[in-house]
Amino acid sequence: MATKCTKCGPGYSTPLEAMKGPREEIVYLPCIYRNTGTEAPDYLATVDVDPKSPQYSQVIHRLPMPYLKDELHHSGWNTCSSCFGDSTKSRNKLILPGLISSRIYVVDVGSEPRAPKLHKVIEASEIQAKCNVSSLHTSHCLASGEVMVSTLGDLQGNGKGSFVLLDGETFEVKGTWEKPGDAAPMGYDFWYQPRHNVMVSTEWAAPNVFKDGFNPAHVEAGLYGSRIFVWDWQRHEIIQTLQMTDGLIPLEIRFLHDPSATQGFVGCALSSNIQRFYKNAEGTWSVEKVIQVPSKKVKGWMLPEMPGLITDILLSLDDRFLYFSNWLHGDIRQYDISNPQKPRLAGQIFLGGSIVRGGSVQVLEDQELTCQPEPLVVKGKRIPGGPQMIQLSLDGKRLYATTSLYSAWDKQFYPDLIREGSMMLQIDVDTVNGGLKLNPNFLVDFGKEPLGPALAHELRYPGGDCSSDIWI
């Protein structure tokens, strides 16, 4: 078990110590009603994932937000392992930014972890007045005790990759993290590595471009991102822009968990590849493609070629395995990254997707598969959509997946998700030899929610996980 520490702060002293942490018993995830036809607020669902519990694989609590159409998306913590050395800090609030509403909800999960309650609403008007930004995305806690939230837009819905700073105790908006006028042209995700005085951020598109759906013409017009921005962590300014070759729509970005590491990976959604970024011999930063998922030639789809669409990536806490989801093709892959320059495919599992046998799409040419995969049926339910958000247990032995990307894109690419709701699945991981296997006893069907089918998104464990915690 992890070392007990009576005078320590939240989280764990090291990533390897975190791997010894307790098994997850509950999971928090936002559920979205925007674009579904149900006039109800988004809510935070609490799911029981303890196999010994009589409520295993069930939603045990729902916390509705006070407004409609927020489009809750990602979440983070008031504090995490970056504050491990501060015994005055406690991980007890979940930060929930609204991608469309630009509000931030602070949820108390410390008083009663199995029944969270709303602690504070930070109105969009306050954020707009102090920061001149909109469309909030990734939230990370900082060693300073502050919370930082990335943005995608300005007040007119144009691109603006800024970072909102919140006080980690009062949750007052303090302003923006970056120097005045030094926001990136577009934003999305970010990760920092203070030992090397660096932060990296990615770009999706301006809110005006992505909010109502995906238009291929916008790609041709250069309206989607293809860059990584490298920031000076102490000076709060961009010091390098990495223009990726064949790196369209870089979304989730992760440094290795080892705080001394000078490399990491980014998943490029549309070009369906994984690129490695690293500090080079000259002391600046470079990027190279290390994994490519080939597109499939198809008939009966919106385009003649279908990309995998890599929408989420994770690194195990020991930095041994990289996982990613191909939302359109329908598979999750596990790569051994013992040699980060040459990842090796170690496991793969299909969990639905757009190319299943008997569906509307016919695959004409496939560089990887000899036949179209069978539809996935769990507990008698055919799974709509494809795997999207993924979360790994601390010990690396269980992977959880949900199937919703973003309500407007769900409606466009997987209309079944709107009618039937999204699903939450669990995959068992072989951490010795590699390999992924579905747990047939686990399914959370968000199509059966009390107010109608909902779109469940990113997953969080109460004690932190491999995409929320950063070690310094």
From Swiss-Prot:
Pfam families: SBP56. It is a peripheral membrane protein. The modification N-acetylalanine is found at residue 2. Keywords: Acetylation, Cytoplasm, Membrane, Nucleus, Oxidoreductase, Phosphoprotein, Protein transport, Selenium, Transport. Its main location: nucleus. The keyword Transferase does not apply. GO terms for cellular component: cytosol; membrane; nucleus. The modification Phosphoserine is found at residues 111, 467. The N-terminus is blocked. It is found in: Nucleus; Cytoplasm, Cytosol; Membrane. Highly expressed in liver, kidney and, to a lesser extent, lung. GO terms for biological process: brown fat cell differentiation; protein transport. GO terms for molecular function: methanethiol oxidase activity; selenium binding. Its EC number is 1.8.3.4. Pathway: Organosulfur degradation. It is an enzyme of class 1 (oxidoreductase). Catalyzes the oxidation of methanethiol, an organosulfur compound known to be produced in substantial amounts by gut bacteria. Selenium-binding protein which may be involved in the sensing of reactive xenobiotics in the cytoplasm. May be involved in intra-Golgi protein transport. Interacts with USP33. This is Methanethiol oxidase. It comes from Mus musculus.
